């Protein structure tokens, strides 16, 4: 019963915060919970859902390469600027931080509750996005702003 109340509270917060992604995600989880004998499905989604989400985001990121909007020339150009090098460094940093984050969650699963709450607060109150690879771009943006670098 507690999980239903918690999910409904999240749905209300998502609705009040006008966060469509969180609303959809919460409704999907509630609908899955309504179906009998779905505990294995919920467990599988809980264990593999992040990887599936990262895969979907990665596909979306690769689309400009597939359509020809981005090519080797753009990659070469990126390496000729401080902004490009910062982006590469942030990508490496995020992957290392993610590695350590997974280790932390494995060692202390109770932190998951705080992370979920913090993510929901960031998504709803600060109009953030609950995503992984996009964090690298966000960190890159912050460093670029601090160093007053041009995006060109």
Curated annotation (Swiss-Prot):
Main location: membrane
Topology term for the membrane: Multi-pass membrane protein
UniProt KW keywords: Cell membrane, Membrane, Transmembrane, Transmembrane helix
Compartment(s) of residence: Cell membrane
Transmembrane segments: 25-45, 52-72, 85-105, 115-135
Pfam families associated with the record: DUF441
Single GO cellular component term: plasma membrane
Family: Belongs to the UPF0756 family.
This protein's name: UPF0756 membrane protein lp_1894
Organism this protein belongs to: Lactiplantibacillus plantarum (strain ATCC BAA-793 / NCIMB 8826 / WCFS1)
């Amino acid at each position: 019963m507690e999980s239903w109340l918690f999910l409904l509270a999240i749905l209300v917060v998502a609705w009040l915060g006008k966060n469509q992604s969180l609303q959809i995600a919460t409704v999907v989880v509630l609908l899955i919970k309504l179906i009998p004998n779905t505990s294995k499905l919920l467990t599988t989604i809980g264990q593999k859902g992040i990887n599936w989400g990262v895969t979907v985001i990665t596909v979306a990121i690769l689309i400009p390469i597939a359509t020809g909007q981005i090519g080797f020339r753009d990659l070469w150009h990126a390496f000729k600027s401080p902004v490009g090098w910062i982006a590469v460094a942030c990508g490496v940093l995020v992957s290392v931080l993610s590695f350590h984050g997974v280790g932390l969650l494995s060692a202390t699963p109770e932190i998951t509750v705080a992370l979920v709450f913090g993510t929901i607060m960031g998504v709803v109150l600060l109009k953030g996005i609950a995503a992984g690879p996009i964090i690298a771009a966000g960190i890159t943006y912050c460093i670029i702003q601090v160093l007053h670098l041009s995006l060109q």
